[in-house]
Amino acid sequence: SNTDGHIRSLNRRMKDRGWDARLTLVEQSLNSVVEIGDDLVDLSTIENPPPVQYAVWPFVEYGEHNIIAADGGTTKSLMAMAMAVSYSYGKIVMPGTSVPLDPKPTLYLDYESSSATQARRRRQLLAGIGIAEEAGKILYKRMYSPVQDAATELYDLIASRGVGMVIIDSGARAVGGETSSEEMVIPYFNAVASWGVTILTIAHKPKDSTSRGPAGVAQWWNQARNYWELVKDQTPGQNEVHLSVRHDKANDESLHVPLSYRLAFGEDIRYHGLDTPVSTNIMSQMPISTQITNFLLNSPQSTVKEIAIGIERSDKVVDNEIRKNEGKLYYGSKEAYNRRWSLIEDKKEDPWAIL
């Protein structure tokens, strides 16, 4: 066995030291501290399991590992702080979201910024919604080593302060830069899962824009229960940014429609909700259905070819998306060929509409 092999190896170095008994004590000590999972549960004993819950709906699912990813310089860290303020103060920072009735402290583990920067962001976000600062709501810890190296220390901190959500900014530094190593990424997910709280990891997108999920191995995508991507457009010299947040993965519910914002900077910071992206750059990165819907809002009764030209996609891609959502999002005219398509919400105003 492995234990016998260790004993023989140790005896070659130092004989007659009672290695068998010593290794038994080591095994007992390890078993007492190493987490191997929760207690066994008979699922039939769980009565009336609750529906999916959120720390901040729809961005952060309660008790799960959530990821928000974006390119560098897209205000993703500011959005992370907005999630912390929403959750811990119980107030809506970003329109279109909702917050729990029982706020708890947030722990912000930061590899990329400073306590002064994060305190300023928190203060400006609170000023933007007219809320006074309170102590003990958002706890901050500057990090330097990978999370798994400090997992036990952090667990003690989380438990002692009643923390309900942990934000890790960013995932790349939290695994020591080894984003493409499963030997680092999987232990990271295991470590934070052992804390038993809601997790939000901030991650970077890969340089290849066609890749799915954060930069690194597929486990970033596979292990996330809820995954959003943030897309930004800004005119140089302006004190506002246009943003859209696209929902790419949901393990427990259907995908949410993209949410768009105008983020205004000044003495305070405010998120203003938008019905649709005002930036063509942002719109081009939204789901095909969103692009088609936006086109038909402005140009109803359009053919597939007209839509395809308008959104710069192939006829086949547009036709497949429309057929998939016919009667749900779109309705077509009665012609057998070259049907003209409009939004289903406009059907009441069109007496000639035939599904």
Regions found by a protein language model. Name each.
Residues Q53, S115, A119, Q148-T152, ...:
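Amphipathic alpha-helical transducer elements in NTP-driven molecular machines
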